[in-house]
């Protein structure tokens, strides 16, 4: 069936939900309407809805199904359920993954501790539990935990270790724990320290900042510049994560502020979380192919984002009112939040800040416009390359050889899906590439890409095709990108692309969006490969060449703490004492090696 043949005669004028499908019956988009006939009429008329993303959607639609309901509230709930069921390409769809970084305090233990966790739910899962966050990143979360352990000496050990300890650990000697495990402090003293830490996490950071500034000044006066620099880094992280910001005028409120950026089918929503005048964090959601109206988009987003156990603030600021007045009462909150477009100057400033955050997220996408249609037309791909994998490898004179692939999916990089391979073959780059590709596709448990991109010329392109043929994966498209020596255009080096449509290669203008898109993929893969190589190289040096007595387990703990060989050798004795498993002899050997390396 062609969409031009779709008839409105049998479409009801009642509230309901409509499902747009492609020629294969796949649901592309789910929408709701107060009047189904009027809404679909606006889509089907030639001069109806002229928004850029609507023709983009209708061009792919072959049929429309409708479901009639009693009222708008039922339509909203049904729309949300169908979006979850069919996961349409052009709707808002939030992935239910563990992306919240929080700090948790379990009050069930008589001597509570603060620990970093990752969780879906932003409301406590236990009756006696406090959650703080979410924080912008794992780095911010662990930085706060480090500050707390320094200024609020609470225990960090497991409950089992706490119950079996006979003497205090090294953290007590460093004045970073009150040692309640061996009775060195009273419960009243410990509780007072815990309450101060809780106030800090709620945003009362002024006293801590003042103490840090005084400590930095004292360390500088005593010429302990390395220690002063470490304190300054901590102070900077606190200010970035917890200090008063532009939102300080809303000191009494618990607010989420939703900002929206749109460009064609691209939609980005930023959520700023404000508590007691502090900007606690921001989360960003990118929908590369969204066809919803702004009011409908916010209804879908809010219903999904605040589903079930998610933290629900008292107020939600939005630039456009959701199209469902009953929305606050559909959320799982004891007190329905107020969802509104603020009229005050301060509220408008917050919305502007949220919009700016959303626009900032779009910059990497806007600088390289995603040329999906151009890619398909130029290279004659059989389908849209929604999932792209780019491969690279790194080594030094054949040692510590690593191969990697990165994933670009639905309009953005997906670092969680990046993978690393330790290369075992001892041939050239082609042999290493063949090993990586073979190992990647030998197991088909991971989702297959629509397109793979490799750094190399005609030989790499042919080798990739040969491997895919052997694995019976000829449906995966391949593009190889190679620098064209001697060819320059306006100071920009030209590069040649090899693919099935152009097996001898094609030269594109250096300003071409397609070329820049592939360069972006290749550069990200190269960056990831170099980082993986450096980690492997550092670990190899540490375990096999440099320091006796530092085995695999201690190496892992050191690298988790300091990230690189250079930082390990420059670490102070106090910093090294915080690494699990290191003895005084180990610390002495590391510092001796550091002096030799200077």
UniProtKB/Swiss-Prot annotation:
Its main location: cytoplasm. Gene3D superfamilies: 5' to 3' exonuclease, C-terminal subdomain, GIY-YIG endonuclease, UvrC, RNAse H endonuclease domain. InterPro entries: GIY-YIG_endonuc, GIY-YIG_endonuc_sf, GIY-YIG_UvrC_Cho, RuvA_2-like, UVR_dom, UVR_dom_sf, UvrABC_protein_C, UvrC. Residues 206-241 form the UVR domain. It comes from Chlamydia muridarum (strain MoPn / Nigg). Residues 13-92 form the GIY-YIG domain. The UvrABC repair system catalyzes the recognition and processing of DNA lesions. UvrC both incises the 5' and 3' sides of the lesion. The N-terminal half is responsible for the 3' incision and the C-terminal half is responsible for the 5' incision. GO terms for cellular component: cytoplasm; excinuclease repair complex. The keyword Cytoplasm applies. It is found in: Cytoplasm. The lineage of its organism: Bacteria, Pseudomonadati, Chlamydiota, Chlamydiia, Chlamydiales. The keyword DNA damage applies. This is UvrABC system protein C.
């Amino acid at each position: 069936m062609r969409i031009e043949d779709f008839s409105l005669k049998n479409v009801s004028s009642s509230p309901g939900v409509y499902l747009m499908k492609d020629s294969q019956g796949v649901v592309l988009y789910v929408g709701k309407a107060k009047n189904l006939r009027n809404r679909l009429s606006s889509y089907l008329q030639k001069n109806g809805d002229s928004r850029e993303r609507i023709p983009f959607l209708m061009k792919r639609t072959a049929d429309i199904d409708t479901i009639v309901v009693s009222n708008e509230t039922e339509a909203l709930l049904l729309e949300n359920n169908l979006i979850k069921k069919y996961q349409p390409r052009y709707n808002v769809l939030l992935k239910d993954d563990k992306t919240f970084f929080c700090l948790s305090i379990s009050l069930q233990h008589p001597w509570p501790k603060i620990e970093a966790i990752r969780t879906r739910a932003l409301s406590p899962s236990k009756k006696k539990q406090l959650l703080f966050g979410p924080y912008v990143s794992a780095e911010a979360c662990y930085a706060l935990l480090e500050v707390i352990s320094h200024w609020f000496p609470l225990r960090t050990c497991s409950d089992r270790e706490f119950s079996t300890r006979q003497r205090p650990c090294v953290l007590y000697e460093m004045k970073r724990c009150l040692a309640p495990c061996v009775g060195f402090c009273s419960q009243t003293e410990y509780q007072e320290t815990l309450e101060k830490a809780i106030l800090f996490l709620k945003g009362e950071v002024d006293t801590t900042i003042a103490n840090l500034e005084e400590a930095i000044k004292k360390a500088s006066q005593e010429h302990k510049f390395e220690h002063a620099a470490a304190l300054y880094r901590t102070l900077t992280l606190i200010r970035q994560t917890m200090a008063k910001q532009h939102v300080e005028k809303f000191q009494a409120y618990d607010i989420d502020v939703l900002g929206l950026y749109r460009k064609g089918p691209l939609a980005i929503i930023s959520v700023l979380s404000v508590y007691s005048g502090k900007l606690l964090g921001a989360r960003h959601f990118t929908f590369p192919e969204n066809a919803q109206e702004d009011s409908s988009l916010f209804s879908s987003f809010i219903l999904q984002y605040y589903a079930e156990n998610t933290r629900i603030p008292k107020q939600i600021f939005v630039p456009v009112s959701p199209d469902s007045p009953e929305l606050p009462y559909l959320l799982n909150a004891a007190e329905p939040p107020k969802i509104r477009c603020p009229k005050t100057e301060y509220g408008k400033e917050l919305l502007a800040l949220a919009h700016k955050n959303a626009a900032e997220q779009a910059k990497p996408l806007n600088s390289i416009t995603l040329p999906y249609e151009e890619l398909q037309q130029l290279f004659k791909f059989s389908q849209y390359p929604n999932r792209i994998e780019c491969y690279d490898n790194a080594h030094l004179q054949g040692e510590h050889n690593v191969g990697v692939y990165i994933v670009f999916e639905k309009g953005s990089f997906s670092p969680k899906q990046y993978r690393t391979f330790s290369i075992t073959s001892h041939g050239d780059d082609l042999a290493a590439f063949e090993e990586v590709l073979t190992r990647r596709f030998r197991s088909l448990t991971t989702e297959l890409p629509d397109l793979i991109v490799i750094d190399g010329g005609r030989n790499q392109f042919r080798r990739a095709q040969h491997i895919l043929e052997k694995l019976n994966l000829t449906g995966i498209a391949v593009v190889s990108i190679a620098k064209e020596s001697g060819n320059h255009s306006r100071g920009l080096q030209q590069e040649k692309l090899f693919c099935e449509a152009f097996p001898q290669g094609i030269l594109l203008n250096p300003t071409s969006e397609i070329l820049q898109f592939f360069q972006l993929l290749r550069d990200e893969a190269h960056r990831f490969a170099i980082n993986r190589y450096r980690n492997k190289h550092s670990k190899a040096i540490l375990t096999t060449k440099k320091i006796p007595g530092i085995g695999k387990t201690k190496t892992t703990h050191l690298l988790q703490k300091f990230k690189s060989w250079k930082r390990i050798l420059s670490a102070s004795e106090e910093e090294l004492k915080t690494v699990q498993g290191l003895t005084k002899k180990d610390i002495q050997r590391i510092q001796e090696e550091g002096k030799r390396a200077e």
